[in-house]
Amino acid sequence: MRVIWIVIGFLICINIFAEDFRIDGIRFFCRVPAKYNNHSRILVLFGGRNWPGNKTLQTYRFDAVADKHQVFLLSPSFHDRNYWEPEKWSGKTLLKAIATVERKYGLTPQKIYFYGYSAGGQCSALFYSWMPERVGAWAAHACGVYPNQPIQNAAPALITCGESDAERYQISRHFAYRYREAGGELLWKPYPETGHELSKDALKLAHAWFDAVLSEVKPVAYGEDDMLKIKPKKRIDVEYRNPLYSEKIRELWLK
């Protein structure tokens, strides 16, 4: 009986804080933070392939980070039609949804943030490349498709991937090198003995990373790829350099 009431309480909590609306036939779910003001920002959460937005919100559990920073969580229920390619149709639909939230809550347009897993990771990477001037930072887990050419001096990024997710792991690692060489700060974290699933460790790092990025803090340290060693920034070649924005991020990156 106690378990039943816990589940009911959880569902009520979700219903209180998440609303839904449709744009161009696509259902969007929006979680409103406990407090917000006209400078509140929006974090777009892209789910796995064809996930409905409410599943994404419940799986990613960014609630605490969102409330701390007064951030709106917006999740689209994209499905089919190569939706991860924003230039075809989904990009305009997302921009309409963002504008809808901004109008309803009186928000002054701010930088947008992206996070996604699997096909959602592709969305995060490709939507950023499509609208870089609007994006403050982006992150992806288990992503296998990235822009052909990284943007020069790009926004901060986080990429994580299981090492057993072999093809995506190789693609992600090499993209990380090129992104850094083009002037972007990128944190790269592989997970040994992990496949394509969205692990708890990957989500913990994503929560900590967005907490720091939304706080607009500077790195407290730098880590080197492969060796997993903390070194002075100048002693790490740029293509292997990981910015660690907080002690929590350093702890999770070294884990």
Give the positions of each predicted feature.
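Short amphipathic alpha-helix adjacent to the substrate-entry channel of hydrolases
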Residues: 55-74
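Gly/Ser-rich "nucleophile elbow"/oxyanion-hole loop immediately N-terminal to the catalytic nucleophile
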Residues: 34-39, 83-119
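N-terminal cap/lid segment of alpha/beta-hydrolase-fold proteins
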Residues: 17-36
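Short beta-strand/loop motif that positions the catalytic acidic residue
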Residues: 158-161
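Alpha/beta-hydrolase-fold serine-hydrolase catalytic core, especially in secreted/extracellular enzymes
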Residues: 181-185, 193-255
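Short beta-strand element of the alpha/beta-hydrolase
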Residues: 39-49
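Conserved alpha/beta-hydrolase "acid-adjacent" motif
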Residues: 166-172
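Primarily recognizes the serine-hydrolase "nucleophile elbow" in alpha/beta-hydrolase
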Residues: 103-104, 110-154
